[in-house]
């Protein structure tokens, strides 16, 4: 996921619900890789319960009713779904901006041209090391790095912009500058770093999760590093970056405006249930792909109704529902903490962000 600039349009729907800016749609869970951090624990074989072409198109028909969302076609690897370009073309014809997050290994010149023709605006490719040895070890398949680099070349040839996504782990922290240099060299338009969420296969990567203090260091480094390049840099699943950005900007006497910080000045950290949602391969709507919280199924309830009325989404939209230090925190509206990490580390999706070291000025809830 993550292949997206921020969507545009009004902030609320006619009933007062927030507009949905982004939908990550897991059009298939099948994948040809075996990544150590995969939230879906995906495998090659087809999964039962995936949508037919007609069902998928009927779902697409409902998306404009929640705003003008960007649709992220994700997986698994979305390229393992045979009708994916037909679905993208259908969504594009509806006026929806479509982006895609393949792993890159399956992209051929023909696939890249079909992406372009169907309306794919951007691809995100995950690269977790600056070379084959480090990336392939994380991705679980020898040759994955070389295949992804080749696929990226085909995207370039087809005129499709791409971004690189990198998951932060203890093993690759020391390689971040080299990964960025790789992004520059291959022509990426953006580099998004993802803080590891311990779900799916990543639940077994406890030794790779860095501490709250280390995350603070990484995100401060990221804040400084973004000043050195014109490439768009974004911290994802790292809502506390938006606190750090404001703290640092205040220290430097810089206003947090789009002119100074781009779209980072206009969005918040965790968008789950407030501007973003995830739809699984079987139709379950979730706040995000890392938080398997059942907010309703589009096979039983129209998607716009789920977006507007889900009790879980209502919680995420109400500051008083947050417990621990996230509720009273003065940075709540721009951060919100990672709900998936809260759930996976405490069992409570409304608990405080476990990998944040900040202590709010007050610790009593806002009532």
From Swiss-Prot:
Top-level taxon in the UniProt lineage: Bacteria
Alphabetical UniProt keywords: 4Fe-4S, Heme biosynthesis, Iron, Iron-sulfur, Metal-binding, Oxidoreductase, S-adenosyl-L-methionine
GO biological process, one term: heme biosynthetic process
Enzyme class: oxidoreductase
Pathway: Porphyrin-containing compound metabolism; protoheme biosynthesis
Pfam families, alphabetized: Fer4_12, Radical_SAM, SPASM
Radical SAM core domain mapped to chain residues: 15-238
GO molecular function: 4 iron, 4 sulfur cluster binding; metal ion binding; oxidoreductase activity
Binding site for [4Fe-4S] cluster: 31, 35, 38
Reactions catalysed: Fe-coproporphyrin III + 2 S-adenosyl-L-methionine = heme b + 2 5'-deoxyadenosine + 2 L-methionine + 2 CO2
Entry EC no(s): 1.3.98.6
Disulfide-bond pairs as recorded: none
InterPro entries: 4Fe4S-binding_SPASM_dom, Aldolase_TIM, Cmo-like_SPASM_containing, Elp3/MiaA/NifB-like_rSAM, PqqE-like, Radical_SAM_PqqE_MftC-like, rSAM, rSAM_AhbD_hemeb
Keyword Iron: yes
Cofactor(s) demanded: [4Fe-4S] cluster
Function: Involved in siroheme-dependent heme b biosynthesis. Catalyzes the conversion of Fe-coproporphyrin III into heme by the oxidative decarboxylation of two propionate side chains.
Recorded family membership: Belongs to the radical SAM superfamily.
Record protein name field: AdoMet-dependent heme synthase
Lineage: Bacteria, Pseudomonadati, Thermodesulfobacteriota, Desulfovibrionia, Desulfovibrionales
Gene: ahbD
């Amino acid at each position: 996921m993550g292949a997206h600039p921020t969507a545009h349009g009004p902030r609320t729907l006619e009933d007062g619900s927030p507009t949905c800016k982004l939908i990550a749609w897991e059009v298939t869970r099948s994948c040809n890789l075996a990544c150590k951090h995969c939230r879906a624990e995906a495998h090659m074989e087809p999964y039962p319960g995936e949508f037919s072409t007609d069902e998928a198109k009927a779902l697409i028909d409902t998306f404009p009713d929640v705003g003008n969302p960007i649709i992220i076609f994700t997986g698994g690897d979305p390229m393992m779904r045979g009708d994916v370009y037909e679905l993208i073309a259908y969504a594009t014809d509806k006026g929806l901006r479509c982006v895609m997050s393949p792993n890159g290994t399956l992209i051929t010149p023909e696939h890249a041209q079909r992406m372009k023709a169907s309306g794919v605006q951007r691809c995100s490719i995950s690269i977790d090391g600056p070379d084959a040895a480090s990336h392939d070890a994380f991705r679980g398949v020898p040759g994955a790095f070389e295949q992804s680099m080749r696929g990226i070349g085909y995207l370039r040839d087809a005129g499709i912009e791409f971004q690189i996504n990198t998951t932060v782990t203890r093993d690759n922290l020391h390689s971040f500058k080299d990964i960025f240099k790789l992004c520059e060299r291959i022509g990426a338009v953006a580099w998004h770093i993802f803080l590891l969420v311990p779900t799916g296969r990543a639940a077994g990567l406890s030794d790779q999760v860095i501490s709250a203090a280390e995350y603070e260091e990484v995100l401060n480094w990221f804040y400084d590093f973004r000043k050195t390049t014109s490439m768009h840099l974004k911290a994802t699943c790292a809502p506390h970056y938006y606190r750090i950005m404001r703290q640092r900007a205040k220290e430097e006497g810089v206003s947090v405006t789009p002119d100074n910080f781009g779209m980072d000045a206009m969005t918040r950290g965790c968008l789950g249930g407030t501007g973003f949602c995830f739809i699984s391969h079987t139709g379950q709507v979730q706040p995000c792909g890392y938080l398997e919280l059942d907010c309703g199924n589009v096979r039983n309830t129209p998607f716009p109704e789920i977006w507007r009325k889900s009790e879980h989404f209502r919680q995420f939209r109400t500051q008083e529902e947050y417990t621990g230090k996230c509720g009273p925190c003065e940075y709540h509206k721009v951060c919100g903490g990672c709900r998936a990490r809260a759930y996976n580390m405490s069992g409570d999706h409304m608990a405080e962000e476990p990998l944040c070291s900040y202590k709010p000025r007050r610790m009593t809830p806002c009532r």
